[in-house]
Amino acid sequence: MNDVIIRQLAHLIPYQPLWEAMQTFTALRQSQTTDEIWFLEHEPVFTQGLAGKPEHVLNSGNIPLIRTDRGGQVTYHGPGQLMMYLLLDLNRLGLSTRTFVRTIENTVAESLQEWGIPAQGKETAPGVYVDDKKICSIGLRVRKGFSYHGLALNVAMDLTPFSCINPCGFKGLMMTQIQDYVNPIEMDAVKRTIIPLFLKNFGYNQPAIMVETSLEFLIDDHLRSFSEKLGERETVTNSRQN
């Protein structure tokens, strides 16, 4: 069993600084760094993945469009959508990228089935679907065995912006959300359902759960830790030279 830290960000988070925070965490982490899962909701934004094509953005309007470094095509993020950013060491977990994606899909589908929603993955396209409607999108990046980015689960949101794009590069793909099947639905209830399943399916111990009001935790926890390690290395190097 491995340790994991779960961070729940309390406010709507703009995409750009969150993306930069993920990159920083991944670049600085070491083999002993504890895995983290970040739960949050974004301010409205379209994100274009590495495989994204301009023709799949039909009309972004006043919603910003950001080209990012995750896999996949264009999608929408906004209030009422649960983002789970998975900052994991796949080598330590013994997971290939393919198995990682399948485990995410199966875990999300299992959580939705607990709400009576007949969700499942598809062999031909990443994500989780209810019939032919997509309820959860997955976009990842893996560097040196460390994953970042994650999944977007539609809970209780305005789905209208999806009509301004070809979601995930599929013309005419319909989107759905938990609220269409379970109404009312609360975001915290969805988290309480999905967290234990992620812990079980990925082999994690009970997590440390932290509520964050901003991205300052990255500076407080990780950059300081990295600086301390760098200082220790410099001290050792200097002592050897002396």
Swiss-Prot record:
Coiled coil: none annotated. This is Octanoyltransferase. The active site is at residue 168. Catalyzes the transfer of endogenously produced octanoic acid from octanoyl-acyl-carrier-protein onto the lipoyl domains of lipoate-dependent enzymes. Lipoyl-ACP can also act as a substrate although octanoyl-ACP is likely to be the physiological substrate. The record marks 134 as: Lowers pKa of active site Cys. It is found in: Cytoplasm. In the reaction, the free carboxyl group of octanoic acid is attached via an amide linkage to the epsilon-amino group of a specific lysine residue of lipoyl domains of lipoate-dependent enzymes. Transmembrane segments: none annotated. The gene is lipB. Keywords: Acyltransferase, Cytoplasm, Transferase. Belongs to the LipB family. Residues 31-206 form the BPL/LPL catalytic domain. Pathway: Protein modification; protein lipoylation via endogenous pathway; protein N(6)-(lipoyl)lysine from octanoyl-[acyl-carrier-protein]: step 1/2. One of its GO terms (cellular component) is cytoplasm. One of its GO terms (biological process) is protein modification process. It catalyses: octanoyl-[ACP] + L-lysyl-[protein] = N(6)-octanoyl-L-lysyl-[protein] + holo-[ACP] + H(+).
